[in-house]
């Protein structure tokens, strides 16, 4: 339990940041799910559109430290490979 005023404020700030970061992580997962759903449906055009929409969001969250940059790169690489597999 935070006792000093400084520790109490930090605890409040941490709670606020945790809630905000959770919503941002959820947004990234939603964009990823849209791409995966289009891939599973076999719709290459929709998958490509969803991927193009997801990439800036993934990159932005990696820049902010919401997700690790390597995780962002891994997601983008795997999704792009799956989309290219649909077209072939």
Swiss-Prot record:
InterPro entries: Ribosomal_bS20, Ribosomal_bS20_sf. GO terms for cellular component: cytosol; small ribosomal subunit. It holds the Pfam family Ribosomal_S20p. GO terms for molecular function: small ribosomal subunit rRNA binding; structural constituent of ribosome. GO terms for biological process: translation. Belongs to the bacterial ribosomal protein bS20 family. This is Small ribosomal subunit protein bS20.
């Amino acid at each position: 339990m935070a006792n000093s005023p400084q520790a109490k404020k930090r605890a409040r700030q941490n709670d606020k940041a945790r809630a905000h970061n959770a919503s941002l992580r959820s947004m990234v997962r939603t964009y990823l799910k849209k791409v995966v759903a289009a891939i599973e449906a076999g719709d290459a055009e929709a998958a490509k559109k969803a991927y193009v929409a997801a990439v800036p969001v993934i990159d932005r969250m990696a820049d902010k430290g919401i997700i690790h940059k390597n995780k962002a790169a891994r997601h983008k690489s795997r999704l792009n490979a799956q989309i290219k597999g649909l077209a072939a």
